[in-house]
Amino acid sequence: MQDKIVIHGARAHNLKNIDVEIPRDKLVVVTGLSGSGKSSLAFDTLYAEGQRRYVESLSAYARQFLGNMEKPDVDAIDGLSPAISIDQKTTSKNPRSTVGTTTEINDYLRLLYARVGTPYCINGHGAINASSVEQIVDKVLELPERQRLQILAPVIRKKKGQHKSVIEKVQKDGYVRVRVDGEVYDVTEVPELSKSKQHNIDVVVDRIVIKEGIRSRLFDSIEAALRIAEGYVIIDTMDDSELLFSEHYACPVCGFTVPELEPRLFSFNAPFGSCSECDGLGIKLEVDTDLVVPDASKTLREGALAPWNPISSNYYPNMLEQAMKVFGVAMDKPFEDLSEEDKNLILYGSDGKEFHFHYENEFGGVRDIDIPFEGVINNIKRRYHETNSDYTRTQMRLYMNELTCGTCQGYRLNDQALSVRVGGQQGPHIGEISDLSIADHLDLVSQLTLSENEAIIARPILKEIKDRLTFLNNVGLNYLTLSRSAGTLSGGESQRIRLATQIGSNLSGVLYILDEPSIGLHQRDNDRLIASLKKMRDLGNTLIVVEHDEDTMREADYLIDVGPGAGVFGGEIVAAGTPKQVARNSKSITGQYLSGKRVIPVPEERRVGNGRFIEVIGARENNLQNVTARFPLGKFIAVTGVSGSGKSTLINSILKKAIAQKLNRNSDKPGKFKTITGIEHVDRLIDIDQSPIGRTPRSNPATYTGVFDDIRDLFAQTNEAKIRGYKKGRFSFNVKGGRCEACSGDGIIKIEMHFLPDVYVACEVCHGTRYNSETLEVHYKEKNISQVLDMTVNDAVEFFQHIPKIQRKLQTIKDVGLGYVTLGQPATTLSGGEAQRMKLASELHKRSTGKSFYILDEPTTGLHTEDIARLLKVLARFVDDGNTVLVIEHNLDVIKTADHIIDLGPEGGVGGGTIIVTGTPEEVAANEASYTGHYLKGKLHHE
């Protein structure tokens, strides 16, 4: 087998016909500036070809189900293995997908509970065991010799009625005696039963004495009793004690039944086991009392009930006042001071009690009727479900939230599944074990109390569960729970989960391609991740990791630096070799940072801010432990802490949503907290994330930043356009008029090839320009609109230097380091880091009030150290204008430049959720309890 992968003539995206050799069975890191061509080499060339070759080996019939793989633009690749890509984009947003289902641990847990679980009655009647006739007979024969007993068949358990037909059937079947409510009667002398009382009726099948040779008769009698009572039998020992047996998993006392234990019973994705109320989602759309009564200090007359306050008619306020008068509830008392009984009446109605309602509308219509008071919550529910009006449904939805399902308490499963426990009655059910953190889950699984027989059955299942939990633990995910929805995971978390799954598969000879697995990982956990990557390598796999993390680069066997710049200025191999060899390469920007020749400097002084702050008091969402956090305004703030310490909960779930609720009247409810102060000091909240700036190729930097509007205005003002009567819309490729209709302004045409990949060719009519020939005859400075869209931002800044409105917007794109991007480049081809900087550029050219609050969650994702240096300069401009910038970040180069740090921890999950230290980087570095401080110390002193 070849000892290296050899690529000849790679030209995907901006790659410049490069040749590169990659050693096999090594940990190879591909690095370079954002947009330099790293992903084009790793994913769009290597992975695409590896996957395509595998699919090509399948039959034409199988290929039609897998979709067609496009051949990457490369001359040849030798020594390629089957490729598996682990990137950040494939997280399932399906609410049924959880950490447990993604890692397949749920499958093993379901098997464990089906094989060694014991059901317990949900009404507290103890263990429910299913017994065969043979087992029941053996149990009865353990009773002392000469013991007298009755064998009873319980046909009625706690049911109201006279049950005459039951007694008649017993008599017809030839039985002589029945026991009714504890008294034995001749079947012909049973007294008339009360219709309104609950009764128990047992058929006396046999009366016997335990002695030698009785087994055969006992067997027949028990079998008959089980048949009559549909699987139940009572052994009455005639001395006030009874033995209850069942052929099924059913409680003999209350009749609670559990079907046969099999894995599907424990799946919330199958109707057999899922909660019928929420269909296995664990959450339901319910009316949220906090949204119905947003300000409990108001009285009913002042409008405490939001849905019935600002309304087009007075119908509901009238109804409320008349009902409250009848039911004796004060209209002028603050809602919070009303009794629980009164609050329940207002929210949930009068439980059938009626009042007289008189109402006259503005058109003279009169309503005079005796009706029960419905209650505001029931009213919202009814109108939401019954209305045909989209407007009404939207209005009612404002007062609803996804709340934990009250039937299954969020466990997603039905009572039958949740009645089964492992490790005795005090052991966990499958919902409880899934709610434990990975670390606690590991401890519990190692300490389960099982019988000798159960231990033998469970051993192989527990091994698989432990192995997978250990892998998750080793990649820094010890704080996650198996019940956590996959859609709530960050890109880094979901990637490390799939990484753990791959480690568990123990494959060898595979080419793994990873995209920044260190995202969202604290420096403390980085070593464990690198150890996991090395373990995969040692199994005989080749790992190609697109990464900017300095520690990962230094630990790599081989380092490839793509560059030297980004976009058209990149696409070449600048350096390749061991990390030490790359560090000595003077042409490599990466090498200069590795050798210490280039550094991001520590600011000489920290900003003091404007003296104001926003304060969140008593935050208690997820793992936050009644945290109070103060965010000083006019500063660059970094929120830090190990993975799972509560950073995202504090910022994204509470601070961001609380500010948005106040400033933007956003209905998205923040997490639990007591109060928040200081929002009046900011006038705008801007969340700048790495999501795409557009979902279709029609969206591009020019349209996103708004500069295309100005450019179209400029073209419409040229003499040629005026003579022809062309308006601004003529120069849009999205509407009829100026665009090429053959390709609808796309510039390309898709040709379906069925069993071969779809082919995209330039439109034959417009030759890829997007516009018709008449539109292209209009020029500004000898360039038509299509040629302008093909310009890089750098070229366009010069081209439009005498048009300040356009030049200013383009300059901001250049300032954030995106000068290499073309104005018409499809938004779908921009990386996450590029999209984020495009959003920053769009913000930069807006007039600043100095009271904006910017939030960025891990802005360094996908950014090289050189890109980070540029990003920090842009963020500094926002702060220098008086605004506040807050970043959630693990990157020490960013943290060391902050004015103020809020460090959460000390651990992730239940071990986190408190603020360890706040202050300047120097103050945090001096704190012994802070993991961030420990690593920061080296950075500050090193500089």
UniProtKB/Swiss-Prot annotation:
GO biological process: any one?
Answer: nucleotide-excision repair
**What's an example of a GO molecular-function annotation for this chain?**
zinc ion binding
Q: Name one GO cellular component term.
A: excinuclease repair complex
Q: Name the SMART domains on file.
A: AAA
What subcellular locations does the record give? Cytoplasm
Instruction: Cite the ABC transporter domain residue spans from the record.
Output: 308-589, 609-937
What Pfam families does its record include? UvrA_DNA-bind, UvrA_inter
- Please indicate which superkingdom the organism of origin belongs to: Bacteria
Start and end residues, zinc fingers (C4-type): 251-278, 740-766
Annotated InterPro entries: AAA+_ATPase, ABC_transporter-like_ATP-bd, ABC_transporter-like_CS, ATP_grasp_subdomain_1, P-loop_NTPase, UvrA, UvrA_DNA-bd, UvrA_inter
Keyword annotations for this protein?
Answer: ATP-binding, Cytoplasm, DNA damage, DNA excision, DNA repair, DNA-binding, Excision nuclease, Metal-binding, Nucleotide-binding, Repeat, SOS response, Zinc, Zinc-finger
So where does ATP get bound? Answer: 32-39, 641-648
Major localization class: cytoplasm
Q: Which family does it belong to?
A: Belongs to the ABC transporter superfamily. UvrA family.
Q: What does this protein do?
A: The UvrABC repair system catalyzes the recognition and processing of DNA lesions. UvrA is an ATPase and a DNA-binding protein. A damage recognition complex composed of 2 UvrA and 2 UvrB subunits scans DNA for abnormalities. When the presence of a lesion has been verified by UvrB, the UvrA molecules dissociate.
Assembly and partners are described as: Forms a heterotetramer with UvrB during the search for lesions.
Q: What is this protein called?
A: UvrABC system protein A
| Species name | Streptococcus pneumoniae serotype 4 (strain ATCC BAA-334 / TIGR4)
Taxonomically, what lineage is the organism? Bacteria, Bacillati, Bacillota, Bacilli, Lactobacillales
